[in-house]
């Protein structure tokens, strides 16, 4: 009898423990939550997510790299389970072996070491344009591969089994910095079979969104451009399906519904009316009212105007300097609300000599936050050009301010506001005079952000039409021998503190030549209904971690959310 009672009690305890591991009952899938993450994007290729903050916010939910940077700016393991260093100085042999965790793609296939290797080889393909290429140049033969001097098969990275990636380096490097850089969204794993098929069928991998296969906590399960985006829990994300792990063991929300039919202003009104519960982009007209309530963090990006130096109006450095000098960046930050006046290209969130050491604080102010119109007019006061922007309230407001200032000097400025797809085409083809870019620092290290202005590190490969097969400059067309030498010296220096000197000199020279005009350091600001949602976490890159987000009494909201989902799919 005592044994029977003990068995019953044990069974009851186990049942209680199992229930405590899940928020679901029976066949339930979980909460459907209406959110607004940011403005619509049209390219979901993580290797190209560096022209605006919204792309980072969305793709950060879909993909997971080997490491991550937490909200405190510290490197953490993500897909990477462990690593070990193998050194043989006598043979000049330096390697890192990275073991990845057991997880699956959103279609149920195991994430393999080969998926990481493929993604990196894709970035280093001479015919593929990607600014993140320089992050991989420490790998043996990487630069030669990107320049077309070596075969991709000569690249020093390989999958030695299903879970281990072996990286061979050109020399002894700062291994901690390499791991820090692996948090870059561009370096996440990709499936070769998926990318190849989509590029063949659709002409572009990143635009075949309705069937996108991802390894992060969420997966795209429905998309109607200009209308809605539906992100469902990736049911294979770290779950042990053989042992029947609870559906919500690693990702609690079942579905995130994003309304793109409404803009930031309309979504802000919907938030105020209780129709959505998380607002990741606050309407411009309401920002001042939310300044105290919003959670605000500094981003790894700078809103910048790129000057196409191949255009006659921008070939003269004095014109570029004049346009920069005339702007009151304090006023621009005031217009945007959630921003700081830019005093250089690199924002304060980027590290310098060590983790947590601010590059911007150490480098000081390279450009003034205040306007000097008289000084600007002494440099240049005439010219005509078109300013290309994305068609949204914030970029329009900034552009109208700049246009007013510049036309007051004597310039003629035309603003061209484009959809996301048309904007990307203009940016990638260089079909612009001046273009607004949320310039993303790909990592917490300043090297990658500065190196792209050296053609050898631009990620654009080589010009096969040129008899010298020269490296193709970055989209602004900037090419300065003195600047390029500073970047080469920084790349050759393995001591992070010593390398800092070259990088600061490079930024100073860039701001003297001004092929890019930094305006504001971007900030992220969001609000959510704390009576309904909890468990939202931040990341250093500015996207949210919704894995453990809970919706109070979510079953009461289920009918409304389900109706929204149904309407969106019709």
Predicted feature residues:
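N-terminal lobe/hinge region of extracytoplasmic solute-binding protein
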Residues: 36-88, 213
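Extracellular/periplasmic solute-recognition and catalytic clefts
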Residues: 37, 221-230, 257-311
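Periplasmic-binding protein-like
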Residues: 45, 290, 310-353, 397-398, ...
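Aromatic- and charge-enriched surface segment that lines or borders ligand/interaction sites
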Residues: 82-135, 166, 313-315
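Surface-exposed binding/hinge segments that line
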Residues: 131-196, 224
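Gly/Pro-rich hinge or "lid" segments in bacterial periplasmic/extracellular proteins
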Residues: 172-173, 180-255, 265
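Extracytoplasmic/peripheral linker and loop segments enriched in polar/acidic and small residues
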Residues: 336, 414-423, 450-529, 556-570
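Structural transition elements
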Residues: 337-379, 391-395
């Amino acid at each position: 009898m005592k044994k029977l009672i003990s068995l019953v009690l044990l069974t009851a305890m186990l049942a209680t423990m199992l229930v405590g591991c899940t928020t679901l009952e029976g066949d339930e899938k979980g909460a459907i939550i209406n959110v607004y993450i940011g403005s619509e994007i049209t390219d979901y290729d993580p290797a190209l997510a560096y022209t605006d903050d919204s792309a980072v916010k969305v793709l950060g939910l879909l993909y997971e790299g080997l490491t991550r940077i937490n909200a405190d700016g510290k490197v953490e393991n993500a897909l990477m389970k462990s690593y070990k260093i193998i050194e043989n100085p006598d043979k000049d042999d330096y390697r890192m072996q990275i073991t990845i965790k057991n997880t699956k793609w959103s279609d149920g296939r195991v994430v393999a070491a080969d998926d990481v290797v493929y993604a990196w080889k894709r970035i280093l393909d001479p015919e593929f344009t990607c600014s993140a290429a320089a992050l991989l140049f420490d790998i043996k033969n990487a630069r030669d591969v990107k320049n077309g001097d070596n075969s991709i098969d000569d690249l020093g990275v390989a999958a030695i089994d299903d879970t281990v990636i072996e990286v061979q380096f050109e020399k002894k490097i700062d291994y901690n910095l390499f791991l820090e850089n692996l948090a870059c969204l561009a370096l996440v794993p990709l499936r070769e079979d998926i990318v190849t098929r989509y590029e063949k069928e659709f002409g572009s991998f990143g635009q075949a969104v309705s069937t996108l296969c991802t390894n992060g906590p969420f997966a795209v399960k429905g998309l109607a451009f200009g209308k809605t985006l539906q992100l469902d829990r990736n049911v294979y994300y770290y779950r042990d399906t053989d042992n029947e792990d609870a559906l919500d063991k690693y990702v609690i929300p079942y579905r995130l519904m994003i309304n793109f039919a409404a803009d930031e202003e309309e979504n802000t009104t919907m938030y105020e009316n209780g129709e959505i519960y998380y607002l990741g982009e606050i309407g411009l007209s309401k920002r001042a009212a939310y300044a105290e309530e919003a959670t605000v963090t500094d981003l790894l990006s700078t809103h910048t105007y790129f000057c196409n130096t191949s255009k006659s109006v921008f070939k003269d450095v004095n014109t570029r300097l004049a346009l920069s000098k005339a702007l009151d960046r304090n006023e621009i930050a005031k217009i945007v609300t959630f921003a700081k006046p830019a005093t250089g290209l690199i924002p304060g969130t980027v590290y310098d000599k060590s983790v947590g050491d601010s590059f911007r604080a150490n480098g000081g102010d390279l450009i003034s936050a205040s306007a000097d119109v008289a000084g600007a007019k002494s440099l240049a006061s005439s010219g005509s050009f078109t300013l290309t922007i994305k068609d949204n309230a914030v970029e329009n407001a900034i552009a109208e301010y700049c246009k007013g200032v510049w036309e007051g000097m004597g310039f003629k400025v035309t603003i061209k506001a484009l959809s996301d797809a048309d904007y990307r085409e203009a940016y990638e083809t260089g079909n612009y005079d001046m273009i607004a870019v949320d310039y993303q620092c790909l990592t917490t290290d300043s090297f990658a952000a500065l190196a792209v202005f050296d053609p050898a590190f631009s990620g654009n490969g080589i010009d096969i039409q040129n008899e010298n097969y020269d490296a193709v400059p970055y989209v602004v067309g900037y090419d300065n021998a003195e600047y390029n030498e500073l970047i080469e010296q920084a790349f050759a220096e393995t001591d992070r503190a010593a390398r800092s000197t070259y990088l600061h000199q490079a930024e100073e020279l860039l701001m003297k030549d001004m092929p890019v005009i930094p305006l504001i350091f971007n900030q992220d600001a969001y609000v959510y209904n704390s009576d309904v949602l909890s468990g939202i976490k931040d990341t250093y890159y500015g996207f949210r971690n919704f894995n453990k987000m809970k919706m109070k009494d979510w079953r009461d909201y289920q009918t409304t959310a389900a109706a929204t989902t149904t309407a969106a799919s019709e």
